[in-house]
């Protein structure tokens, strides 16, 4: 087995590119501690240096294989170890997936993301998803896959099939990873990210907040993302959706200002990445989402469902974008 470990940048290992900055955890904590208005203003300035502030990238996420996952992640309703009422389902037929991708494109999405509840795919699974990727790509959509830990050669196969992005989140602060996920390590995640980069795929990598972590631990998550070299092209920031039956069902609610701070700090530390408002938007007011856009979020998951949980309806998102004069990016613009 070859290990392609995507290393976190160390201060004395930086490549000689002036745009690259190493972020100490304490520096990220200092950003979190800025006065709220100053932090949002700074993030908005950084955002405008690299993006059109009126542009937003729309992704649609579909679970192509739901439930029965052998992993033990305390936040996830798809784990077979928790009784959440979710029924295990076989993989969707390619015809059904393509039809949903067509609908997503018609409604304005430029990227179609597909997730499967595996610890990692088997070689036979890669053959199936490669066919699916090719069919979705032929529609004129960007493609993204989240299929778990990859073995040698799998990332290359996905790249050859036409996959654009591979999603593999770091979930939480590396120092508390084992407290949240019990069947894999942070190093396992880093190894797959290394394989993905080695294959020439773009990286979608973010995390989840609201899992009873402290602010310094949120800073640790952002620092671990910002110090990936190169930085992820796409950074999804999820607010925990508490699902009955999971250990995180009783997690304490995260104050909304702390979530906006997280978006702002992600924008400042990863200035050229797309920062996506991901899970948890159903609990966010329009005003809160607007502040997130001002603070540098420029992507959302668009569609009524995220894997197994609810998402705002398309009509509501379209209305909000109209109110804010936001326009969706097309595939070639992303």
UniProtKB/Swiss-Prot annotation:
The family this protein is said to belong to: Belongs to the radical SAM superfamily. Biotin synthase family.
Organism this protein belongs to: Haemophilus ducreyi (strain 35000HP / ATCC 700724)
Residues binding [2Fe-2S] cluster: 113, 144, 204, 276
Keywords: 2Fe-2S, 4Fe-4S, Biotin biosynthesis, Iron, Iron-sulfur, Metal-binding, S-adenosyl-L-methionine, Transferase
Assembly behavior: Homodimer.
Residues involved in [4Fe-4S] cluster binding: 69, 73, 76
Entry EC no(s): 2.8.1.6
Gene Ontology molecular-function annotations: 2 iron, 2 sulfur cluster binding; 4 iron, 4 sulfur cluster binding; biotin synthase activity; iron ion binding
UniProt keyword annotation of Transferase present: yes
Catalytic activity: (4R,5S)-dethiobiotin + (sulfur carrier)-SH + 2 reduced [2Fe-2S]-[ferredoxin] + 2 S-adenosyl-L-methionine = (sulfur carrier)-H + biotin + 2 5'-deoxyadenosine + 2 L-methionine + 2 oxidized [2Fe-2S]-[ferredoxin]
Pfam families: BATS, Radical_SAM
Gene this chain is encoded by: bioB
Gene3D superfamilies: Aldolase class I
UniProt name for this protein: Biotin synthase
Entry function: Catalyzes the conversion of dethiobiotin (DTB) to biotin by the insertion of a sulfur atom into dethiobiotin via a radical-based mechanism.
One GO BP annotation of this record: biotin biosynthetic process
Cofactor or coenzyme needed: [4Fe-4S] cluster; [2Fe-2S] cluster
Pathway(s) where this gene product acts: Cofactor biosynthesis; biotin biosynthesis; biotin from 7,8-diaminononanoate: step 2/2
Lineage: Bacteria, Pseudomonadati, Pseudomonadota, Gammaproteobacteria, Pasteurellales
EC top class, as a word: transferase
Domain Radical SAM core stretches: 54-281
SUPFAM superfamilies: Radical SAM enzymes
